[in-house]
């Protein structure tokens, strides 16, 4: 059985880890970095770039370079958060036939799980290159506050990438695993994991206990905001730069897609620099042009200015912390450790606010970029049976229920219930002789169902005629360890039953997932062909170069006809190398190798002759030296050299 890898599929960056023995290992990607930008670019020739190569070309290809796609995963197009992003993203967000938010690149509509699958494929390949064996199973992390549709969509992305997703695990819980397994502190500890990433915010209160030699991680409560993160901080900086430039130059950069992409890069860079310095300079020459000529952007920005721009965003993270503490039934003073996760927690102002709320400094010994992937890898080793000393008890982040008479949300499973869990309740009909009931499943905290998220609906038909309130219909809710919901309804009189795994009334159908899996496999085949073609071209170039060089040096030793044949074969190979037919290139490589055989023989003979001359000259010199030595009187008193052994091993 192969290893189950741990993947942190982030909004801005992603990371992959494994467990070697009991030691977690974050794996470096093909560019040598431990994290990979979650950026995907679709090129004109059909090539798909992922990570740093995609990020590098974003400025020149903004409409076809996708980033922060995780913010769209499992979401409807009409949701206000999606509508807000439409005006901000340089790429096109469109409405799918099922009402979901999809993206459009190069006249092609793509589902967010399909795009995220490209990042997961890169993570999978990174692990395979390191392990030297195929990887088919993974634990993937999601924000704790992700709802059912978002979890389901993440699982779909894994399938499209060719991974069997063994478990979906919450990011703060994964970070707690990484922290807890790394520490040898005994006794029970309550920790707060404050996770502010690129696109989402989570806070979880977790109890770590030692139970009979095994570490038990119990999530007491979780809260958050799935549309608050580093991308929003970047946007505040971008808006500020645009307004300052408009004041200064009278030009609105928000209408210029290329300029926006450059501003995005500059904003991210400024934000990072201001975490370690008090001031930075945003310098973008030739940012745009008007009738008077090119315009340059030069703007100084202080840390204080940045903090004033994003203060409201940081404050928004504190209310979920309050709710999480209350839901966990603990006091702020009961928290032993505060752990910061996500790149945004490097910002001094964020650390300051967290310290102010919890009354203590956050731990500095947890890597905010890598802890989540490490925790996922630990959970992978638990699932594969390699580790038996860890027990993880997670919770469902939001209440689940059904719509009952009057549009009321009747909660079946309340938020922060430990999962997996089951709950059943008996309901009845609202009308006389009602032949069927529609079960509408919602997720959320509002009293009325319409204020919550509809996850799905199904019918239970064939109910025998009876007065209203007489039939006994048992509705059962069952949440698995991934936090994914299965709902059933049963007429107790007839035994008739209907069950569904909640696939949001949007989401991808099985057929769509299968098609995307096939597309991904075809892409992998295309990638392989492209690599083989590149190798063939490299081989052709090397042969052309060496043959031309030999022809320059030794061509005059060949007959005119032979030389012409070689030159013609070189020309044919050059033409073939410019095309895209690997078989044609291989054939022309063989043809050139064959006709230049005579030339090769001439080169070889010449080298042998030179080597022979060198050897003869060397032998003569050697003989001279030997003769000189014989003229010296022989000294028979050979003295043994003294030596002593030095032992370097300390």
From Swiss-Prot:
A Pfam family recorded for this sequence: HSP70
Phosphothreonine: residues carrying this PTM: 200
Domain of life (superkingdom): Bacteria
Region (Disordered): 612-650
Entry's induction text: By stress conditions e.g. heat shock.
Single Gene Ontology MF annotation: ATP-dependent protein folding chaperone
UniProt keywords, alphabetically: ATP-binding, Chaperone, Nucleotide-binding, Phosphoprotein, Stress response
Gene3D superfamilies reported for this sequence: 1.20.1270.10, 3.30.420.40, Actin, Chain A, domain 4, Substrate Binding Domain Of DNAk, Chain A, domain 1
Compositional bias of kind Basic and acidic residues: 641-650
Low complexity bias (residue ranges): 612-632
HAMAP family on file: DnaK
NCBIfam families associated with the record: PRK00290.1, PRK05183.1, prok_dnaK
Functional summary from the UniProt entry: Acts as a chaperone.
Family assignment from sequence similarity: Belongs to the heat shock protein 70 family.
Name listed for the protein in its UniProt record: Chaperone protein DnaK
GN (gene name): dnaK
């Amino acid at each position: 059985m192969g290893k189950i890898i741990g993947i942190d599929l982030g909004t801005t960056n992603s990371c992959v880890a494994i467990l070697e023995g009991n030691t977690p290992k974050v794996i470096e990607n093909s560019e040598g970095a431990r994290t990979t930008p979650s950026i995907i670019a679709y090129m004109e020739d059909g090539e798909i770039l992922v990570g740093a190569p995609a990020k590098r070309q974003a400025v020149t290809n903004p409409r076809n370079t996708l980033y922060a796609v995780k913010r769209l995963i499992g979401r409807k197009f009409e949701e206000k958060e999606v509508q807000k992003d439409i005006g901000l993203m340089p790429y096109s967000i469109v409405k799918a036939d099922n009402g979901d938010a999809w993206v459009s690149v190069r006249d092609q509509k793509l589902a967010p799980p399909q795009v995220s699958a490209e990042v997961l494929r890169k993570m999978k390949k990174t692990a395979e290159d390191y392990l030297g064996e195929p990887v088919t199973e993974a634990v993937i992390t999601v924000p704790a506050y992700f709802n059912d549709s978002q979890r389901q969509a993440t699982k779909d992305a894994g399938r499209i990438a060719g991974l069997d997703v063994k478990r979906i695990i919450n990011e703060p819980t994964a970070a707690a695993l990484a922290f807890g397994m790394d520490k040898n502190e005994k006794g029970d500890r309550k920790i707060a994991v404050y996770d502010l990433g690129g696109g989402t915010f989570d806070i979880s209160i977790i109890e770590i206990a030692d139970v009979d030699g095994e570490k038990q991680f119990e999530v007491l409560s979780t809260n958050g905001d799935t549309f608050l993160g580093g991308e929003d901080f970047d946007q505040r900086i971008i808006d500020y730069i645009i307004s300052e430039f408009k004041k200064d130059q009278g030009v609105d950069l928000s209408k210029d897609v290329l300029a926006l992409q450059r501003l995005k890069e500059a904003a991210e860079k400024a934000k990072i620099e201001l975490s370690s310095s008090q001031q930075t300079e945003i310098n973008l020459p030739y940012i745009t042009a008007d009738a008077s000529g090119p315009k340059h952007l030069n703007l100084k920005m202080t840390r204080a200015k940045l903090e004033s721009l994003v203060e409201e965003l940081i404050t928004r993270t504190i209310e979920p912390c309050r709710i999480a503490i209350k839901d966990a039934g603990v006091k702020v003073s009961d928290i032993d450790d505060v752990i910061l996760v996500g790149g945004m927690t490097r910002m001094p102002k964020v650390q300051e606010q967290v310290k102010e709320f919890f009354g203590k400094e956050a731990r500095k010994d947890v890597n905010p970029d890598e802890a989540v992937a490490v925790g996922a890898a630990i959970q992978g080793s638990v699932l594969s049976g390699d580790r038996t000393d860890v027990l993880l008890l997670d919770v469902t982040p939001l209440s689940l229920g059904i719509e009952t008479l009057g549009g009321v949300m009747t909660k079946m499973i309340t938020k922060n219930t430990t999962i997996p869990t089951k709950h059943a309740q008996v309901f009845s009909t609202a009308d006389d002789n009602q032949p069927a009931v529609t079960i509408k499943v919602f997720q959320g905290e509002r009293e009325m169902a319409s204020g919550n998220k509809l996850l799905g609906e199904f019918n239970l038909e064939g109910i025998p005629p009876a007065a209203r309130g007489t039939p006994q219909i048992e509705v059962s809710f069952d949440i698995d360890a991934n936090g994914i919901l299965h709902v059933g309804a049963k007429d107790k009189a007839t035994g008739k039953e209907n069950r569904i795994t909640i696939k949001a009334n949007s989401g991808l159908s099985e057929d769509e997932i299968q098609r995307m899996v096939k597309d991904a496999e075809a892409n992998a085949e295309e990638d392989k062909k492209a690599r083989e073609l590149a190798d063939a071209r490299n081989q052709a170039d090397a042969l052309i170069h060496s043959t031309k060089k030999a022809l320059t040096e030794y061509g005059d030793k060949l007959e005119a006809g032979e030389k012409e044949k070689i030159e013609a074969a070189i020309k044919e190979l050059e033409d073939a190398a410019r095309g895209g037919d690997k078989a044609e290139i291989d054939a022309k490589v063989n043809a050139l190798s064959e006709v230049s055989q005579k030339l090769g023989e001439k080169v070889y003979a010449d080298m042998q002759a030179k080597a022979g001359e060198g050897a003869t000259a060397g032998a003569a010199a050697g003989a001279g030296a030997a003769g000189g030595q014989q003229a010296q009187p022989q000294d028979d008193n050979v003295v043994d050299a003294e030596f002593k052994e030095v032992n370097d091993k300390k």
